[in-house]
Amino acid sequence: MERVIDPEALPYRPCVGIVLINREGLIFAGQRIDSPVPAWQMPQGGIDADEKPRQAALRELQEETGIPEDLVEFVAKAPEWVTYDLPPDLLGRVWGGKYRGQRQKWFLFRYLGTDEQIGIATEHAEFSCWRWIGAEEMVASIVPFKRPVYERVVAMFREHLS
């Protein structure tokens, strides 16, 4: 018999998300390496027990894009945490089945380097390729269950985006 998971009984995974913009205000989008279909997203990841959210954002950015802290400029932090629930087909299959979704603190950083300095072939590779895109295309390119999160994040940082 298949185990039934009550999502209400599970916590949200503490996480950060990074909106990385270039000089033109375009957003870094990475194609997920583990997806058989196009699934573009912004860098994101969990917050370690001993980390502050901003530290986690800078660590995740380096792990996923190869971009060190000295090549970005902090622009803004989202005023609130944003949550999303996993769809039923993923519940119990990701993060060891311990979480119902993610609770994310989003940060906006401006990239100060060149495209050649971005290196997604990292030890913790998340992306197979990347590109700079506008805010509306970013929202349209995310998997549907995360789209409301991206809509809120874009709205929070709108003044800085192309």
Swiss-Prot record:
Q: What are the GO BP annotations of this UniProt entry?
A: nucleoside phosphate metabolic process; ribose phosphate metabolic process
Q: Any keyword Hydrolase? A: yes
A Pfam match? NUDIX
Note the superkingdom of the native organism: Bacteria
Q: Which GO terms describe its molecular function?
A: bis(5'-adenosyl)-pentaphosphatase activity; guanosine-3',5'-bis(diphosphate) 3'-diphosphatase activity
Residues annotated as domain Nudix hydrolase:
11-155
What CDD domains does the annotation carry?
A: NUDIX_Ap4A_hydrolase_plant_like (cd03671)
**Cofactor(s) needed:** a divalent metal cation
In this entry, which stretches build a coiled coil? none
- The EC number(s) attached to this protein equal 3.6.1.-
Q: Where is this motif: Nudix box?
A: 45-66
The record, for Gene3D superfamilies, names: Nucleoside Triphosphate Pyrophosphohydrolase
Alphabetical UniProt keywords:
Hydrolase
Q: What the protein does?
A: Accelerates the degradation of transcripts by removing pyrophosphate from the 5'-end of triphosphorylated RNA, leading to a more labile monophosphorylated state that can stimulate subsequent ribonuclease cleavage.
- Annotated HAMAP family: Nudix_RppH
What family does the Swiss-Prot or TrEMBL record give for this protein? Belongs to the Nudix hydrolase family. RppH subfamily.
Could you identify this protein by its name? RNA pyrophosphohydrolase
Instruction: Tell me the lineage of the source organism.
Output: Bacteria, Pseudomonadati, Pseudomonadota, Alphaproteobacteria, Rhodobacterales
